[in-house]
Each structure stands twice: as structure tokens, then as C-alpha cells.
């Protein structure tokens, strides 16, 4: 494993561990400010887990378990959710604190107040960009799966719906990601393997998003 990937993995594990601890120590009742996005993130995680479980059952003769697949992060070099959502308590570079405390105005419904810190806005925007990338990938893959004469598996509207709901709650304007199209005849076996890889990666990202929302709600 290359040093950069190892460093990112360590940072991700530290963030998840810290956010998990913060959530366990916090009051269970969600605060009114972050409740909308916390609710949406919980739905997102539930949909991600259910969709992955269903895919593993349907594709039981395919390499679709966590141990069998080649893990891939499609958001790599495109977003920086782990870094942007790192709690201030874990930041060692004090020169960054002033910019992190700067207030900005947001348009999303995640916060009761549209005024939030620069770093919280950056964190939420990065989550939005993650969701947008996965949304495009899922739609592209679903279009291929629907072409399969066997109609063995395809994504239902639930997972696409919860992604869209959280994106609407975050409400960031950004460039449209074009949906990929190919003139080649789709390889349905490879597409189903790719679906497994994508669902495993999305579940991990959904866990991160849910823990970030829980932490923000508690703080």
C-alpha cells in the first residue's frame, strides 16, 4: 500500500473512531439545528446497508463480499471529506483555526441558522460533492443493468431517492457531472462486479457521513 493511501486510511479510521466516541458521549436527542440532515444521513446509511445486503444475496455466485472485491474510492482526488470534516480537536496546525472559525452563509436546510463556520460549510459541501459523484455512478450503472436481458439486479429508487433528499437538504450549487455513456456493448458480468465494489465503497462513505452529522448535531 502506497504511503499516501496508508495516510488517508489512517486519517479515515481516526476520524471515524473520534466521531463514534463523540456520538456515544453525546445526548441521544438530536438538536433542532442539525436534525434534518441527521435524519437524512440515517436514512442514507440504512439504504446503503440494505442495498448492499440485497446485492450480495442476489449476486451470491459473484465475488461480492468485502473480502473478495478490490476496494475502490471513486471520490479520490475529487473531494476531501475526511480532511474537511476532521473535528477541530484533532487539528494540530493552529494557524488554520482562524479561517476555520470564519462565519459564512449557507442556503441548505441542514441548519436552522444559515450562518455557519467556514469549515462546517466546507465539510457539508464536500459531502454534497461525494453524493453527487455516487449519484451519477449509480444512475450510469443502473442504465446498464436495465439492459441486461436477465434483469438479475438493478438499483431501486429508494437509494437514489435518499441520496437526492440529502443533496437537496445540503443545497449547494455546483457543476453538473455528466452521466457517462458508452457505445460499447456492456459486459454485464463486469458491471455487476463493479456494482458490488461501488456499494461497498458507498456504505463506508455513508457511515462517515452519518457520524459527521451526529457529531455536528451533538456539538
UniProtKB/Swiss-Prot annotation:
Keywords: Cytokine, Disulfide bond, Glycoprotein, Growth factor, Secreted, Signal. InterPro entries: 4_helix_cytokine-like_core, IL-12, IL-12_alpha. The gene is IL12A. GO terms for molecular function: cytokine activity; growth factor activity; interleukin-12 receptor binding. GO terms for cellular component: extracellular space. It is found in: Secreted. Glycans are attached at residues 24, 93, 107. One of its GO terms (biological process) is immune response. Heterodimer with IL12B; disulfide-linked. This heterodimer is known as interleukin IL-12. Heterodimer with EBI3/IL27B; not disulfide-linked. This heterodimer is known as interleukin IL-35. Interacts with NBR1; this interaction promotes IL-12 secretion. SUPFAM superfamilies: 4-helical cytokines. Disulfide bonds join 37-110, 64-196, 85-123. PANTHER family: INTERLEUKIN-12 SUBUNIT ALPHA, INTERLEUKIN-12 SUBUNIT BETA-RELATED. This is Interleukin-12 subunit alpha. Heterodimerizes with IL12B to form the IL-12 cytokine or with EBI3/IL27B to form the IL-35 cytokine. IL-12 is primarily produced by professional antigen-presenting cells (APCs) such as B-cells and dendritic cells (DCs) as well as macrophages and granulocytes and regulates T-cell and natural killer-cell responses, induces the production of interferon-gamma (IFN-gamma), favors the differentiation of T-helper 1 (Th1) cells and is an important link between innate resistance and adaptive immunity. Residues 1-22 form the signal peptide. The lineage of its organism: Eukaryota, Metazoa, Chordata, Craniata, Vertebrata. Its main location: secreted. Belongs to the IL-6 superfamily.
Amino acid at each position: 500500500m502506497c504511503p499516501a493511501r496508508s495516510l488517508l486510511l489512517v486519517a479515515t479510521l481516526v476520524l471515524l473512531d473520534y466521531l463514534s466516541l463523540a456520538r456515544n458521549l453525546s445526548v441521544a436527542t438530536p438538536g433542532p439545528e442539525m436534525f434534518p440532515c441527521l435524519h437524512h444521513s440515517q436514512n442514507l446509511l440504512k439504504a446503503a446497508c440494505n442495498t448492499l445486503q440485497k446485492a450480495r444475496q442476489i449476486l451470491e455466485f459473484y465475488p461480492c463480499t468485502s473480502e473478495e472485491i478490490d476496494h475502490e474510492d471513486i471520490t479520490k482526488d475529487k473531494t476531501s471529506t475526511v480532511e474537511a470534516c476532521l473535528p477541530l480537536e484533532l487539528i494540530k496546525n493552529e494557524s488554520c483555526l482562524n479561517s476555520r472559525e470564519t462565519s459564512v452563509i449557507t442556503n441548505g436546510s441542514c441548519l436552522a441558522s444559515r450562518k455557519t463556520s467556514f469549515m462546517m460549510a466546507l465539510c457539508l459541501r464536500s459531502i454534497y460533492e461525494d453524493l453527487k459523484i455516487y449519484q451519477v455512478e449509480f444512475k450510469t450503472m443502473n442504465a446498464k443493468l436495465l439492459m441486461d436481458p436477465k434483469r438479475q439486479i438493478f438499483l431501486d429508487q429508494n437509494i437514489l431517492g435518499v441520496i437526492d433528499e440529502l443533496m437537496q437538504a445540503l443545497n449547494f450549487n455546483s457543476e453538473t457531472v455528466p452521466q457517462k455513456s458508452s457505445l460499447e456493448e456492456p459486459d454485464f458480468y463486469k458491471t455487476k462486479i463493479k456494482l458490488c465494489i461501488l456499494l461497498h465503497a458507498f456504505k463506508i462513505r455513508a457511515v462517515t457521513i452519518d457520524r459527521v452529522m451526529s457529531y455536528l448535531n451533538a456539538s
